[in-house]
Protein backbone atom coordinates (compact mmCIF):
# COMPACT_ATOMS: atom_id res chain seq x y z
CA UNK A 1 0.00 0.00 0.00
CA UNK A 2 1.46 3.33 -1.09
CA UNK A 3 0.29 6.67 0.30
CA UNK A 4 0.67 9.73 -1.91
CA UNK A 5 -0.10 13.07 -0.28
CA UNK A 6 -0.83 15.25 -3.29
CA UNK A 7 -1.64 18.35 -1.29
CA UNK A 8 -5.40 18.42 -1.44
CA UNK A 9 -5.92 14.77 -2.38
CA UNK A 10 -4.59 11.75 -0.48
CA UNK A 11 -4.12 8.72 -2.73
CA UNK A 12 -3.95 5.20 -1.33
CA UNK A 13 -2.52 3.10 -4.14
CA UNK A 14 -2.91 -0.61 -3.48
CA UNK A 15 -3.43 -1.69 -7.07
CA UNK A 16 -1.05 -4.63 -6.93
CA UNK A 17 -2.99 -7.32 -5.10
CA UNK A 18 -6.54 -7.93 -3.93
CA UNK A 19 -8.41 -10.58 -2.02
CA UNK A 20 -11.37 -10.23 0.36
CA UNK A 21 -9.16 -9.75 3.42
CA UNK A 22 -6.89 -7.10 1.90
CA UNK A 23 -9.87 -5.34 0.30
CA UNK A 24 -11.60 -5.22 3.70
CA UNK A 25 -8.50 -3.75 5.34
CA UNK A 26 -8.07 -1.19 2.55
CA UNK A 27 -11.70 -0.03 2.77
CA UNK A 28 -11.43 0.33 6.56
CA UNK A 29 -8.25 2.37 6.10
CA UNK A 30 -9.99 4.55 3.51
CA UNK A 31 -12.90 5.22 5.87
CA UNK A 32 -10.56 6.22 8.73
CA UNK A 33 -8.35 8.46 6.58
CA UNK A 34 -11.40 10.15 5.09
CA UNK A 35 -12.83 10.88 8.53
CA UNK A 36 -9.51 12.39 9.63
CA UNK A 37 -9.23 14.66 6.57
CA UNK A 38 -12.91 15.60 6.37
CA UNK A 39 -13.22 14.98 2.64
CA UNK A 40 -15.08 12.45 0.56
CA UNK A 41 -13.91 8.86 0.33
CA UNK A 42 -13.52 7.34 -3.13
CA UNK A 43 -12.88 3.63 -3.71
CA UNK A 44 -11.80 2.78 -7.26
CA UNK A 45 -11.93 -1.00 -7.15
CA UNK A 46 -11.64 -3.75 -9.70
CA UNK A 47 -11.89 -7.49 -9.79
CA UNK A 48 -10.35 -9.79 -7.22
CA UNK A 49 -8.97 -12.82 -9.03
CA UNK A 50 -8.74 -16.49 -8.04
CA UNK A 51 -11.76 -16.57 -5.73
CA UNK A 52 -13.34 -19.69 -7.19
CA UNK A 53 -17.04 -20.43 -7.34
CA UNK A 54 -17.89 -17.85 -4.66
CA UNK A 55 -16.34 -14.97 -6.60
CA UNK A 56 -19.63 -13.09 -7.15
CA UNK A 57 -20.55 -13.44 -3.47
CA UNK A 58 -17.17 -12.12 -2.29
CA UNK A 59 -17.42 -9.11 -4.60
CA UNK A 60 -20.95 -8.34 -3.42
CA UNK A 61 -19.84 -8.61 0.23
CA UNK A 62 -17.09 -6.07 -0.40
CA UNK A 63 -19.66 -3.69 -1.88
CA UNK A 64 -21.86 -4.20 1.16
CA UNK A 65 -18.93 -3.43 3.46
CA UNK A 66 -18.20 -0.20 1.56
CA UNK A 67 -21.78 0.87 2.19
CA UNK A 68 -21.64 -0.09 5.86
CA UNK A 69 -18.40 1.86 6.31
CA UNK A 70 -19.98 4.94 4.76
CA UNK A 71 -17.65 5.15 1.77
CA UNK A 72 -18.96 8.11 -0.22
CA UNK A 73 -18.22 6.87 -3.75
CA UNK A 74 -17.62 3.32 -4.91
CA UNK A 75 -16.24 3.29 -8.45
CA UNK A 76 -16.37 -0.24 -9.82
CA UNK A 77 -14.40 -1.12 -12.91
CA UNK A 78 -16.15 -4.03 -14.58
CA UNK A 79 -17.67 -5.61 -11.45
CA UNK A 80 -21.43 -5.02 -11.07
CA UNK A 81 -21.52 -7.10 -7.88
CA UNK A 82 -19.81 -4.28 -5.97
CA UNK A 83 -22.65 -1.95 -6.96
CA UNK A 84 -25.26 -4.56 -6.00
CA UNK A 85 -23.66 -4.71 -2.56
CA UNK A 86 -24.17 -1.01 -1.82
CA UNK A 87 -27.91 -1.05 -2.55
CA UNK A 88 -29.85 0.45 0.34
CA UNK A 89 -26.88 2.50 1.58
CA UNK A 90 -25.85 6.13 1.13
CA UNK A 91 -22.81 5.16 -0.94
CA UNK A 92 -22.91 6.45 -4.51
CA UNK A 93 -22.14 3.70 -6.99
CA UNK A 94 -20.41 4.27 -10.30
CA UNK A 95 -20.00 1.30 -12.64
CA UNK A 96 -17.63 1.57 -15.59
CA UNK A 97 -16.78 -1.07 -18.16
CA UNK A 98 -13.07 -0.25 -18.28
CA UNK A 99 -10.30 1.91 -16.87
CA UNK A 100 -10.48 4.51 -19.63
CA UNK A 101 -14.17 5.11 -18.95
CA UNK A 102 -13.57 5.29 -15.19
CA UNK A 103 -11.05 8.10 -15.54
CA UNK A 104 -13.90 10.37 -16.66
CA UNK A 105 -15.02 10.72 -13.06
CA UNK A 106 -11.65 11.97 -11.79
CA UNK A 107 -12.74 15.57 -12.37
CA UNK A 108 -15.18 15.14 -9.46
CA UNK A 109 -12.38 14.76 -6.92
CA UNK A 110 -11.87 17.80 -4.73
CA UNK A 111 -9.89 19.10 -1.78
CA UNK A 112 -9.43 16.81 1.24
CA UNK A 113 -10.74 13.76 -0.64
CA UNK A 114 -9.12 10.39 -0.01
CA UNK A 115 -8.91 7.99 -2.94
CA UNK A 116 -8.28 4.25 -2.76
CA UNK A 117 -7.24 2.38 -5.90
CA UNK A 118 -7.34 -1.40 -5.41
CA UNK A 119 -7.68 -4.55 -7.52
CA UNK A 120 -5.76 -7.62 -8.50
CA UNK A 121 -2.61 -6.73 -10.42
CA UNK A 122 -3.91 -8.15 -13.71
CA UNK A 123 -6.66 -5.50 -13.75
CA UNK A 124 -4.15 -2.71 -14.37
CA UNK A 125 -5.71 -0.15 -12.03
CA UNK A 126 -2.32 1.43 -11.41
CA UNK A 127 -3.19 3.42 -14.55
CA UNK A 128 -5.87 5.23 -12.54
CA UNK A 129 -3.43 5.91 -9.70
CA UNK A 130 -0.88 7.27 -12.18
CA UNK A 131 -3.52 9.53 -13.74
CA UNK A 132 -4.50 10.90 -10.32
CA UNK A 133 -0.86 11.60 -9.51
CA UNK A 134 -0.31 13.36 -12.83
CA UNK A 135 -3.39 15.55 -12.37
CA UNK A 136 -2.99 16.44 -8.71
CA UNK A 137 0.79 16.75 -8.43
CA UNK A 138 0.77 19.84 -10.66
CA UNK A 139 0.82 22.87 -8.31
CA UNK A 140 -2.49 24.68 -8.47
CA UNK A 141 -4.04 22.06 -10.74
CA UNK A 142 -7.04 21.73 -8.45
CA UNK A 143 -8.06 18.55 -10.19
CA UNK A 144 -8.38 20.06 -13.63
CA UNK A 145 -6.94 17.61 -16.10
CA UNK A 146 -4.48 19.23 -18.48
Predicted regions and their residues:
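ATP-dependent carboxylate-amine ligase
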Residues: 2-146
